A protein has these predicted regions:
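Gly/Pro-rich active-site loop or hairpin
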Residues: 265
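Histidine-centered catalytic micro-motifs
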Residues: 237
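Non-catalytic accessory regions flanking glycosidase/transglycosidase catalytic cores in CAZymes
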Residues: 1-234, 268-272, 276-304, 308-492
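Active-site His/acidic residue clusters
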Residues: 240-262, 308
């Protein structure tokens, strides 16, 4: 028997819905074919957006969507993607597969996608190969409600009212594909760019996010905060879970050993250390204003599926990935006092995707189901939680058998999310809710073998199911199957 303790009277704050953000890049089949098929397509669509994909994403209550990259962002010139499609410039996507990019999906199309999904837009601007003027013009084009050259151009392209885009990333991975910059050089650029990213309405202030560190590059965070911390609202962090150190042989998404399973989970758990250490640096230099941490790229990264373009980053998605998602989201929930946003990579057909498509077919991944099961945390009050765990040791890589987070809705109901990381043993759990008076409990579970996944031929191999649970005087009891994620909703 394992114990989960939740203290209803202790909280670090409200869970920002943006922690459940998504990311879509002009990469492989994420945008084209995955989301956007064009109005002439035989695949049912609304203004070019796949109806099936949009419907599935709406069910997740997606709060914010990052675009157009990724590495693509620092080669993207936004004017190439506005105006009549027949006049748009065709370019080569040099970062991802060397394919032709016709720019038929640009600013207006992306905002239409956000409108259909019901989410905020997060634009990643071009610092690597763009100019301050170009970036400044993009903000004006999107957000100026009065009379100006950019606002007039937007209206000429069919959008009278401003888009009021709130979130703006000042470059992407400036230490790498975004310009191979030193931290000192980027920090000065960030401060310069920030100066010209203006607010055009007191009711719609923009939120500026600096290009942050890769993994444990604490020098980067320190330098950016020290030199440009007063010019931004958040600093980003990128951390991918990669089973093997060799990027040419990262490991298979579906064919992996027990050792690789636990290595993947062990590396995922390192996210907490990274969040805490980068946050400590941010707080040291933020002064009298609060600067957040935006984990705007995270997720698993494996070798691509056989016989697919290596530049498309297409990979399958198993119960192992579901556990990775659950661990990360639990960590983000429990650090919601500092994490203002997180964006899993990526939404469709790329890396740890929510959705896979093949022609007119669509399949929901185990990761999709985790986001659906966890959506009740969005905007809720985080609650202090603790799991009494047993360490699972595999080649000196210890992994706890349980990983949890909890929150409380405005109506008093409590959501407890718990992952059983043990791939062979079920865990009977007793959850004690200190300060609560439970009157009822319902539960769902996502479970399966670590390599279990959904395919186009068998799309419901891994789907949520009801979980038997019993109410107690101060909580509930249940048994978590091996390799599973469960959600418990407790009414009071």
């Amino acid at each position: 028997m394992a114990y989960i303790f939740v203290n209803v009277n202790r909280s670090v704050g409200t869970i920002n819905p943006n922690i459940y953000g998504q990311f879509s890049e002009h990469l492989g089949r994420c945008i084209y074919q995955g989301i956007y098929v064009g109005q002439a397509s035989d695949i049912p669509n609304t203004n070019g957006m796949r109806n099936d994909v949009v419907s599935a994403l709406k069910a997740l209550h997606v709060p914010v969507l990052r675009w157009p990259g990724g590495c693509f962002a620092d080669t993207y010139h936004w004017r190439d993607g506005i105006g009549p499609k027949e006049n748009r410039k065709t370019i080569v996507n040099t970062n991802w597969g060397g394919v032709t990019e016709d720019n038929s999906f640009g600013t207006h199309e992306f905002m239409e996608l956000c409108r259909q999904i019901g989410c905020e837009a997060y634009f990643s601007g071009n610092v690597g190969s763009g100019t301050v003027q170009e970036f400044s013009d993009w903000v004006e084009y999107c957000n100026m409600g009065g009379i100006s050259p950019m606002a007039s151009e937007r209206r000429a392209n069919g959008q009278d009212e401003p888009f009021n885009v709130k979130y703006w990333g000042i470059g992407n991975e400036a230490w790498g594909c975004g310009g191979s910059m030193r931290a000192e050089y980027y920090a000065d650029l960030c401060r310069q760019y920030s100066t010209y990213l203006r607010n055009y309405s007191p009711e719609h202030k923009i939120f500026k996010i600096a290009s942050g560190a890769n993994v444990a590059d604490y020098h980067w965070t320190k330098t950016v905060m020290e030199r440009a911390g007063q010019a931004v609202d958040a600093v980003s962090l990128h951390y991918y879970t990669v089973p093997h150190e060799d990027w040419q042989h990262k490991g298979s998404a579906t064919d992996f050993t027990d050792e690789e399973y636990y290595t993947t989970l062990h590396k995922t758990l390192q996210m907490e250390e990274l969040v805490e250490n980068h946050t400590r640096i941010i707080k040291q230099y933020q002064g009298d204003r609060k600067v957040g941490l935006a984990v705007d790229e995270w997720g698993t990264w494996y070798d691509v599926e056989p016989d697919t373009n290596p530049g498309f980053l297409y990979q399958q998605n198993t119960m192992r990935d579901a556990l990775v998602a659950a661990i990360n989201l639990n960590i983000f929930n429990n650090h919601c006092d500092t994490i203002c946003m997180a964006n899993i990579a990526q939404m469709v057909n790329v890396l740890q995707a929510m959705i896979l498509t093949e022609g007119s077919k669509m399949v929901l991944t185990p990761t999709y189901h985790i986001f659906e099961m966890y959506k009740g945390h969005q905007g809720a009050k985080q609650l202090e939680s603790y799991a009494e765990t047993t360490l699972l040791n595999h080649d000196d890589q210890a992994v706890p058998d349980l990983h949890v987070s909890a929150s409380q809705q405005a109506d008093g109901s409590i959501l407890v999310t718990a992952a059983n990381l043990n791939d062979t043993a079920a865990i009977p759990v007793t959850c004690m809710l200190g300060g609560a008076k439970p009157t009822g409990v319902t539960a769902r579970v996502l479970a399966g073998a670590p390599a279990a996944h959904n395919t186009f031929a068998a799309p419901e191999q891994v789907v949520p199911a009801e979980l038997n649970t019993s109410l107690t005087a101060d909580g509930f009891t249940a048994t978590l199957p091996p390799c599973s994620v469960a959600t418990f909703v407790v009414n009071q």
